[in-house]
């Protein structure tokens, strides 16, 4: 994986230069634009500065991460279609949808499922025939955690909802009761959306915490957003989740660089 390697010196120089210039001197200064991604998403000094050492990532950074992952999936889809669409036995690329943080905020306050789907999907996309996964950030099951990012993934082929958390041990016998309660609540609040998106499937959706993990557990109050980004990258590559704390430190630097250049590597 690319983020397991140390960022190249010139890339480090670019990030550190921008980071130094992003030190905030006033509330107004926080709204100054550091870069614009895809001519659409503006990244402010206040957002970019969160990628500094030992700082917790806020909603603006996590929304930027989701935006970059969606761009990456769109690029893969376009390349796949251009190469394979005329081949015999062609199978369409099963796409992923990466939703912004506001999706989960709206889910937990009970927003009507149909209106919520309409907000995040254009009408032709309501039926998920072309989608395999939907990813969205959630808050960790652990209410005592200050830095609480985790990620959930809806799988429309297997009809499952999986939860990925840097604080969850890979050994299923060590799951705390709070996690079980959280998974029950997750399934309950998502059920109307799942039925709306996939009405032909009326059986039970399985909601579980992913346990095939081979990484060092999160043990601080500022890296959960970076952990979540690492987990998402491995999931997109369909690889076992393996990384250590050094990899997380490198990923924080890499993520800052990718935001500046406006794309994630394939």
Set out the residue ranges of the language-model regions:
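Active-site nucleophile-adjacent alpha helix/oxyanion-hole segment immediately C-terminal to the catalytic cysteine
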Residues: 2-81, 211-266
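Cysteine protease-like catalytic core of ubiquitin/ubiquitin-like
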Residues: 52, 80, 84-266
């Amino acid at each position: 994986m690319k983020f397991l390697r140390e960022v190249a010196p010139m890339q480090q120089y670019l990030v550190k230069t921008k980071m130094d210039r992003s030190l905030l001197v006033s509330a107004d200064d926080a709204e100054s634009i550091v870069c614009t991604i895809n001519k659409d998403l503006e990244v402010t000094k206040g957002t970019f500065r969160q990628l500094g050492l030992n700082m917790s990532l806020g909603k603006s950074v996590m929304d930027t991460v989701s935006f970059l992952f969606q761009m990456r999936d769109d690029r893969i889809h376009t390349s796949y279609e251009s190469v394979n669409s005329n081949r015999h036995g062609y199978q369409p690329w099963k796409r992923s949808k990466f939703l912004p943080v506001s999706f989960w905020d709206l889910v937990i306050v009970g927003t009507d499922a149909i209106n919520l789907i309409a907000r995040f999907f254009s009408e032709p996309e309501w039926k998920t025939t072309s989608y395999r996964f939907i990813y969205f950030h959630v808050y960790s099951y652990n209410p005592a955690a200050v830095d609480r990012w985790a990620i959930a993934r809806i799988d429309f082929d297997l009809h499952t909802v999986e939860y990925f958390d840097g604080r969850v041990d890979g050994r299923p016998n060590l799951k705390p009761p709070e996690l079980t309660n959280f998974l029950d609540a997750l399934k309950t609040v998502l059920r109307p959306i799942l039925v709306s998106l996939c009405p032909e499937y009326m059986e039970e959706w399985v909601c579980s915490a992913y346990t095939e993990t081979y990484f060092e557990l999160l043990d601080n109050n500022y890296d959960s957003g970076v952990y979540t980004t690492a987990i998402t990258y491995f999931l997109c590559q369909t690889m076992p989740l393996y990384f250590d704390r050094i990899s997380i430190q490198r990923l924080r630097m890499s993520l800052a660089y990718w935001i500046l250049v406006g794309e994630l590597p394939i």
